[in-house]
From Swiss-Prot:
It comes from the Bacteria. Keywords: Acyltransferase, Antibiotic resistance, Transferase. It is an enzyme of class 2 (transferase). Residues 21-173 form the N-acetyltransferase domain. It comes from Bacillus subtilis (strain 168). It catalyses: streptothricin D + acetyl-CoA = N(beta)-acetylstreptothricin D + CoA + H(+); streptothricin F + acetyl-CoA = N(beta)-acetylstreptothricin F + CoA + H(+). The keyword Ubl conjugation does not apply. GO terms for biological process: response to antibiotic. Its EC number is 2.3.-.-. It holds the Pfam family Acetyltransf_1. This is Streptothricin acetyltransferase A. GO terms for molecular function: acyltransferase activity, transferring groups other than amino-acyl groups. The lineage of its organism: Bacteria, Bacillati, Bacillota, Bacilli, Bacillales.
Amino acid sequence: MIMKMTHLNMKDFNKPNEPFVVFGRMIPAFENGVWTYTEERFSKPYFKQYEDDDMDVSYVEEEGKAAFLYYLENNCIGRIKIRSNWNGYALIEDIAVAKDYRKKGVGTALLHKAIEWAKENHFCGLMLETQDINISACHFYAKHHFIIGAVDTMLYSNFPTANEIAIFWYYKF
């Protein structure tokens, strides 16, 4: 069951944040006005985990922002955080599914909830950013008809992850 985040369940937001396997990278290319990509597989996969979010109450209290939590038997196994963006799109700031529930429809259900929220709030579509090394996420977005709209090679340049490339995905209604 998907529930909107409230003050009461806000503590559950970081529960689905678990490591994922990095087994390669996407290599985007822009040719004749169209983004395409190939993939490079690593000989030695590794695990990566994002830091927990410091969740602020604005996602409970303010219009133009929302977070939704996916529960199974009272356990939070998925989350999505979304807000209005300056360009008319709803920006998915974060989506996460606990590792034991990946590829079982939880992410798709959360994405459908984000689409519903964005349409109710009159956005032109969804957008998000992920890293080139998160191939599973990139496949997920492509499978759900998102297209690459931009690539940023400098976004992470001041961080230990400077070798990662930001890929911006769009889904227009």
